[in-house]
Amino acid sequence: FVNQHLCGSHLVEALYLVCGERGFFYTPKAXXEAEDPQVGEVELGGGPGLGGLQPLALAGPQQXXGIVEQCCTGICSLYQLENYCN
């Protein structure tokens, strides 16, 4: 894994890879985005207690920018992605 731009589904796939069963969270940029079911929830794969849609946490790590600004607009590393794991 090298530092790279990760946007959209590529960012989600990278978070699944890095976080695994721990899951992950992010801070939506606007409240309207958090109300969108496709933005505010993520479908978790099988496993005890993880089935179905689970709401994402609305609080992220204490950083100047959110994950999209950090990893899509900018370039992020594996270690930066780990900051968003539960």
Curated annotation (Swiss-Prot):
Cysteine disulfide links: 7-72, 19-85, 71-76
One family from Pfam that matches here is Insulin
The main place the protein resides is secreted
Domain of life here?
Eukaryota
Which SMART domains does this one have? IlGF
Annotated Gene Ontology cellular component terms: extracellular space
Q: Where in the cell is it found?
A: Secreted
GO:BP terms for this protein? cellular response to oxygen-containing compound; glucose homeostasis; glucose metabolic process; positive regulation of protein secretion
- Annotated Gene Ontology MF terms? hormone activity
Q: Which CDD domains match?
A: IlGF_insulin_like
InterPro entries to which the protein is assigned, alphabetical: Insulin (IPR004825), Insulin-like (IPR016179), Insulin-like_sf (IPR036438), Insulin_CS (IPR022353), Insulin_family (IPR022352)
- Which residues lie in the propeptide? 33-63
Provide this UniProt record's keywords sorted from A to Z: Carbohydrate metabolism, Disulfide bond, Glucose metabolism, Hormone, Secreted
* Family in the record: Belongs to the insulin family.
Its assembly, as annotated, is: Heterodimer of a B chain and an A chain linked by two disulfide bonds.
Free-text function comment from the UniProt entry: Insulin decreases blood glucose concentration. It increases cell permeability to monosaccharides, amino acids and fatty acids. It accelerates glycolysis, the pentose phosphate cycle, and glycogen synthesis in liver.
Name by which UniProt lists this protein: Insulin
